[in-house]
């Protein structure tokens, strides 16, 4: 479930199809002062700086924040544990609207396989940034 100014969304699935879903929506605006420093890893700062320079019309910092929110929302139902903003390192593909979240802490086991990452998709349109993660129930490896 997610909501922000002018937008609300929920996602549901059968447990036999998906083991977890993470969904977040944010306004496509720059993050408030000092928020970025609280959430960004050194590796993320490198790609973020590059994308903000190459494509300044997009709020890449907000996309990073949204992706981390989706990671947490996918993580918590599997573990029942808190995941800090710096406990996952996000990489973004600007070309195809995907992102990967590499877990920097031990991940949960799904179907006997320990997850080391989550794969997600993102979209920026109509003043919103939306990110989503869906882990299939038949996952046979890291996702």
Regions found by a protein language model. Give the residues of each.
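Core catalytic alpha/beta fold that binds nucleotide/phospho-ligands
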Residues: 1-143
